[in-house]
Amino acid sequence: MSDKRRYFGTDGVRGKVGQYPITPDFVLKLGWAAGRVLAKQGTRKVIIGKDTRISGYMLESALEAGLAAAGLKATFTGPMPTPAVAYLTQTFRAEAGIVISASHNPYYDNGIKFFSYEGAKLPDDIELAIEAELDKDIECVESAELGKASRMVDAAGRYIEFCKSTFPSKLSLSGLKLVVDCANGATYHIAPNVFRELGAEVIAMGVEPNGLNINDQVGATDVRALQKRVVEEHAHLGLAFDGDGDRIIMVDHLGNKVDGDQIAYIIARDALRRGELKGGVVGTLMTNLGMENGLKQLGIPFVRAAVGDRYVMEKLLEKGWKIGAENSGHVILLDKVTTGDAIVAGLQVLASVVGSEMTLHELAKGMTLYPQVLENVRFAGDNNPLEADAVKAAVSEVEAELGSKGRVLLRKSGTEPLIRVMVEGEDETLVKQSALKIAQAVKDNC
């Protein structure tokens, strides 16, 4: 079996709807191939959730047909955050969980990602086995062995109660005014209820999904509307989730953005204060130097993993630590959950706000963020602009100019045809100029 993936990226199979591989026929076959592999593992039962994209209906039906042909029973939750599917997969002792989502991407993209019976991303060998089955012709099991489908009517209530259970029982959100932005995505009927039931006054936005407006000028990837609303409403803070509920960005009462690095820092510092910190914190190559320095001042160990929440998870398991994060808002808290969970992460920050009697603004000031500029350059074809001499020369020039007071990172996105250019340093003007210089070199060689 080849160890090179053709379909699975860092977050499952993803692409533009209607273009291979996000087509009904391929997704049907993917369901069958996954069913063949998973049927050998155990219970022949899977939990399937989705976000609010209009294409979710089509892909859900295709998956159902493929899984049934392989003899698996599918239980559908309807719109449900990705971490909720991971949780329900565990509690129902299912063999796997499947989420139909393209996370923070626009509505015209979609994808399929899988969770193991432990609620974690599928191991590499299982993904490769599924890809091997995709090369075969579909063969249905005997008619008496065909799978059935059912609906889980209480999935939302189950997950809401789980989220609330991760918040300290002696604390309450009473007296807090929160603005909650659900990105017109999968958390729209979950997150506002979690915070309200814990006592907060909640102003909800991004809670009117129509199949096309997911992540559209709302949510964790665009917090401008949330920043404006928090200030207008004189709220204590705001929370923004992405389309599938595995990313969180927060906003303080002044309208300042608080990213995944700062969120992880606040959670780690609070755990240290309570004497409950287990090990250190895992970040990524994109993690701000300010977080690393801030943790160092507290005596908290820090290591970097490759970009992608699956690599953060791998490093956490390797080190035996419990807190990991990406600055984009993936926050993994292994003492609470098995995967990145935005609502649960937000609750831990709120516990710190209430428990310390400090504002989010005050808590976030504990670390100083270095100016960091990210430029995305779209490319097509098989060429690799990162190997171009002109790009390498531009990087070398910038690194020489930044010296020890900054860094440069270029990488291919694992989910989109993008080259990501990141420059970080003490001098914001120089950082911006440097990022544009490298991005232009990349564009010229695409």
From Swiss-Prot:
GO terms for biological process: carbohydrate metabolic process; peptidoglycan biosynthetic process; UDP-N-acetylglucosamine biosynthetic process. Activated by phosphorylation. This is Phosphoglucosamine mutase. One of its GO terms (cellular component) is cytosol. Its EC number is 5.4.2.10. Its cofactor is Mg(2+). Pfam families: PGM_PMM_I (PF02878), PGM_PMM_II (PF02879), PGM_PMM_III (PF02880), PGM_PMM_IV (PF00408). GO terms for molecular function: magnesium ion binding; phosphoglucosamine mutase activity; phosphomannomutase activity. SUPFAM superfamilies: Phosphoglucomutase, C-terminal domain, Phosphoglucomutase, first 3 domains. The modification Phosphoserine is found at residue 103. Keywords: Isomerase, Magnesium, Metal-binding, Phosphoprotein. Belongs to the phosphohexose mutase family. Binds 1 Mg(2+) ion per subunit. Catalyzes the conversion of glucosamine-6-phosphate to glucosamine-1-phosphate. InterPro entries: A-D-PHexomutase_a/b/a-I, A-D-PHexomutase_a/b/a-I/II/III, A-D-PHexomutase_a/b/a-II, A-D-PHexomutase_a/b/a-III, A-D-PHexomutase_C, A-D-PHexomutase_C_sf, A-D-PHexomutase_CS, Alpha-D-phosphohexomutase_SF. The active site is at residue 103. Gene3D superfamilies: Alpha-D-Glucose-1,6-Bisphosphate, subunit A, domain 3, Alpha-D-phosphohexomutase, C-terminal domain. It catalyses: alpha-D-glucosamine 1-phosphate = D-glucosamine 6-phosphate. NCBIfam families: glmM, PRK10887.1. It is an enzyme of class 5 (isomerase). It comes from Vibrio cholerae serotype O1 (strain ATCC 39541 / Classical Ogawa 395 / O395). Mg(2+) binds at residues 103, 242, 244, 246.
